[in-house]
Amino acid sequence: MRLALVSLLVLGLMAPVSAPAQECNWQAGWVKAENAKAGNKNWDSDVVMRFSADFTRRKEAKRVEGYFDQASIGCGQSASLKILGAKSADISLYRIGYYKGTGARLITTIKNAKQITATQSTPPGQYLVKLKSLGYRSTFVPLVITGQVPSNVTFVSSVLTWQAYNQWGGESLYKGADGQRETRAISVSLNRPYDGDGSGQFRYMEQPLVQLMEQLNLDINYLTDIDLDKTPEINSASIVLGGHSEYWTQAMRDVIEKEIYEGTNLLVFGGNTAYAKTYLIDRTMNERIPYRDINQPESLFMGSQFFAVGIKKDLEVQAAQSWPFDTLGKAGKIKGIYGYEADTAMGTKGPGVEVLARSTISPTEKGFVAMSTYYAAPSGAGVLNLGTNAWVCAMANRCPWGHSFDAKTVQQIRKVTTAIIEQAGREKIGNWRVPQIDIPTRP
């Protein structure tokens, strides 16, 4: 095992670029106003979506690729762009949102780009930056522009998890260039593009959720998990995580636990969340240690934890008359939504939880079942873990394991998600919706 180092053709400086002083002012309601603007239909049609860790695609054609020297920037800050595979590239900066169903808005284009600076003209949000160079296939580069303003929800993009699985250059924390686990890297650099289409896991594990939240016209702040590692103040009713947020530093976890203690809701629309402890030193991720191996299982603050991989199970609603599954009416089942990875509260440590839903189980099966759990912290914060990493990708029927979902299932997921976000974006849901404990506290 070794550090995943790649010889790169780099343009631009490695150090953050200073920018002239900027003032950005985002008033309440800015997300609604932003999404009233015209979007760009077919904005992503020339970049075929490819799942991360699909390193074989690199044999197909020449591509222009790149990465920023920072995962996120705030007002007045700049991120330097590194171009690989071509001598230069033009970029199109797309902000992801609803935009009357188009999904993104073109903010600006830059010829022969070297950097991006956040200003009043670049609203906070999740961006996909399209690279174009004559004779090369285009790819995306993700970038978050933070707002740090009062908001209904703060969405956290899980870039550390993307990098753990990122096979660009030949090695990830899971396998080496020969595809074998024995040759995997023990550390990986963030100074490299993402494999697949360049967007990491964003287009399937986060984008469908981001677009739905923006459609609801709630005010949203955007961060990455690297921002959480720097222990920021969260000024939102709820923190939202997408479909796959597996890798957490200790500082990240400390921030989340502090926010729950102080009354901020935690909404987890994924599975296998906060499973692995990692260390971030400058722009390098180091090691992978399951938190449960150091007596800090993720269930201590989430109420449930990862237990199964490679499954596909139906979700059976246990509290059909109560929020949030009451939005489904008499329909008490969502087909095939538990998996590929799933969580449970059985056999874990942590606070007492209500089981909102659980997986179906056949008479021949024994042991634990997948669960969606909910509990209220003493602060009044609600912690809801849907416990499956298919939840977000199923919204757009674009899951990476060969799982597909019919139109009814997609609508069910969107209804429940809408109910969760709208309510939890307003208040401490632990006070509003008192959980009915099914599994008591497990010391």
What are these regions (language model features)?
Residues 213-215, 348-443:
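Extracellular low-complexity, Gly/Ser/Thr-rich intrinsically disordered linkers
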